[in-house]
Amino acid sequence: TPKQKIGLNELRRQLQMTLDLLHRFKYSDLVTMPDWTPDDIIEHGEQLNAISRTTHPMGEVIHMEERTAVLMTYFRNNILHLLAVPASVACCFIQGQELEHAELRRLIRLIYPFMKKELFLKWDFEDIDGVTNEAISALTDIGILSYGKRKKTLVRPRAGSEKAFQLLMLGQAMVPMLQRFYLV
């Protein structure tokens, strides 16, 4: 998040969503996944002094110091390729509620050459429509996107909902890279 703070329950849900997505959208059979729960991941982060928790009247808050947050960008960039396509799909819904399936594929085709240049992405350009469809299937399977009427459109969850927050957080992972593409 922009202030490097998130409620404990929100973080648990976001971690679970990410684990579910990684199991459904497999980058490669060579990628190994830890057999950890969200609480295991949080505990490990605390042991590494990467995150800490404080008690707030509204519940526990997990936060990261500014110095640590800068270092964490290295780790984010190390694994971003695993979720780049689903996160790019999610990014297309940050501002809009609904998008035609064909338009979404066109947008991903438009940015894919830039993404491939910056990240270790294994797919060739001619394969990206199929990969985008796999990402869409994974995102609908975990409930952070749904099909509109007659399956011609994709629809994000209701604004303010837990699923909308998860979609926003996933999409935000690609925003810095997409901003660089736009500026360059």
Can you name each region flagged by the protein language model?
Residues 1-184:
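Membrane-interfacial terminal anchoring regions of lipid-handling membrane enzymes
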